[in-house]
Amino acid sequence: MDPCECSKTGSCNCGGNCSCTNCACTSCKKTSCCSCCPAGCSKCASGCVCKGKTCDKTCCQ
């Protein structure tokens, strides 16, 4: 189960270090923070690494 509500609400706050909007990380203080990602990454069961302000196709760990 996805720990974020991004798939339902389009936004989430994954702890104090990362916020997501439209399933993209909008504020991240560390490289590994948010498990909600764009459609291209939604199949990655192990989560994503934020690249700047978004999670890109290389988010698979």
From Swiss-Prot:
It comes from Plecoglossus altivelis. A divalent metal cation 5 binds at C34, C36, C37, C50. A divalent metal cation 7 binds at C50, C55, C59, C60. Residues 1-28 are annotated as: Beta. GO terms for molecular function: metal ion binding. A divalent metal cation 4 binds at C33, C34, C44, C48. Belongs to the metallothionein superfamily. Type 1 family. A divalent metal cation 1 binds at C4, C6, C20, C23. A divalent metal cation 3 binds at C14, C18, C23, C28. Class I metallothioneins contain 2 metal-binding domains: four divalent ions are chelated within cluster A of the alpha domain and are coordinated via cysteinyl thiolate bridges to 11 cysteine ligands. Cluster B, the corresponding region within the beta domain, can ligate three divalent ions to 9 cysteines. Residues 29-61 are annotated as: Alpha. The keyword Amino-acid biosynthesis does not apply. A divalent metal cation 6 binds at C37, C41, C44, C60. The lineage of its organism: Eukaryota, Metazoa, Chordata, Craniata, Vertebrata. This is Metallothionein. The keyword Nucleotidyltransferase does not apply. Signal peptide: none annotated. A divalent metal cation 2 binds at C6, C12, C14, C25. Keywords: Metal-binding, Metal-thiolate cluster. Metallothioneins have a high content of cysteine residues that bind various heavy metals.
